Amino acid sequence: RYLAICNPLLYSVAMSQRLCIQLVVGPYVIGLMNTMTHTTNAFCLPFCGPNVINPFFCDMSPLLSLVCADTRLNKLAVFIVAGAVGVFSVLTILISYIYILMAILRMSADGRCRTFSTCSSHPTAAFISYGTLFFIYVQPSATFSLDLNKVVSVFYTAVIPMFSPFIC
């Protein structure tokens, strides 16, 4: 978005096919490594008897609540990784939008109005999505609620993607 708005004439040169592939594959590789780490750790944990997972889908926090052993290290790992990925992602988007905002403020009044009307919905959708994800993954265990997390999970897995074509 930054390149398309701030330097539209350089977009096709800077966004090579190789870079586009890297930008798509990179998050998938990082997500796979993150998931495999937590999944491998979960296979090593002792579970007591038959249990039912209550949430909308099987997530790490509800799964850890079914373990018979101490899961503080696992919960800490989930918290640290989710926090680091979240902070890095949000900072990247925030810095990008600061540069975009500075470029928009240098435009003429007419161009500024058109750009704001075109681009303002994307940061809204991004920050709603990141806000719900932070709420789920980066919350103290004292405030953890399976029922509330189920509602928030439905929101960020179904509601936000459903409205994304209309917002963006």
From Swiss-Prot:
The keyword Transmembrane applies. It is a multi-pass membrane protein. Belongs to the G-protein coupled receptor 1 family. PANTHER family: OLFACTORY RECEPTOR. InterPro entries: GPCR_Rhodpsn_7TM, Olfact_rcpt. This is Olfactory receptor-like protein HbT3. Gene3D superfamilies: Rhodopsin 7-helix transmembrane proteins (1.20.1070.10). GO terms for molecular function: G protein-coupled receptor activity; olfactory receptor activity. It comes from Apis mellifera ligustica (Common honeybee). Its main location: membrane.
